[in-house]
Amino acid sequence: MRTINSNQCVKIPKDIKASVKARVVTITGTRGTLKRSFKHLALDMYMPDKRTLKVEKWFGTKKELAAVRTVCSHIENMIKGVTFGFQYKMRAVYAHFPINCVTSENNTVIEIRNFLGEKYIRRVEMAPGVTVVNSTAQKDELIVEGNDIESVSGSAALIQQSTTVKNKDIRKFLDGLYVSEKTTVVKLES
């Protein structure tokens, strides 16, 4: 039996401006603007009032109905991003050769040197809107920040993947840069 209608609403906070036009969602907050297209999904998206965004699917299959909640989660992440921002902390782990990390090009590129004593310099470019800095509070720590959770996590993943150990037993050679903490730039009141 097919579901006739499936819908979800996203509440938009007071300090956030949101707009939907032809399945392109734009969210503006204190930290900037995020824009995302959902044109690849056959869903109805509209704003019944200023503070509510409704995602709706009529006569959908199982996968199409699942996409309704997925889109809402993406929009909630956009709202959280422009309000608080996303921050990933990464730690350099090494047994013998100290890994040297240097940021360049206005904190958008990181150069990783002396990984396992290699002379090769690994350069990792961050996604647009993402910055990476060396932590002042903690030794061997990188802080990756941005408003878009997918860009931040993707950039952190690229850094981690750049330090994969080749032709060695990975159970023994654990050197690399790993994500140690996922948090927000503006600390949440708990």
From Swiss-Prot:
Keywords: Ribonucleoprotein, Ribosomal protein. It comes from the Eukaryota. One of its GO terms (molecular function) is structural constituent of ribosome. GO terms for cellular component: cytosolic large ribosomal subunit; cytosolic ribosome. GO terms for biological process: cytoplasmic translation. Belongs to the universal ribosomal protein uL6 family. This is Large ribosomal subunit protein uL6. It comes from Drosophila melanogaster (Fruit fly).
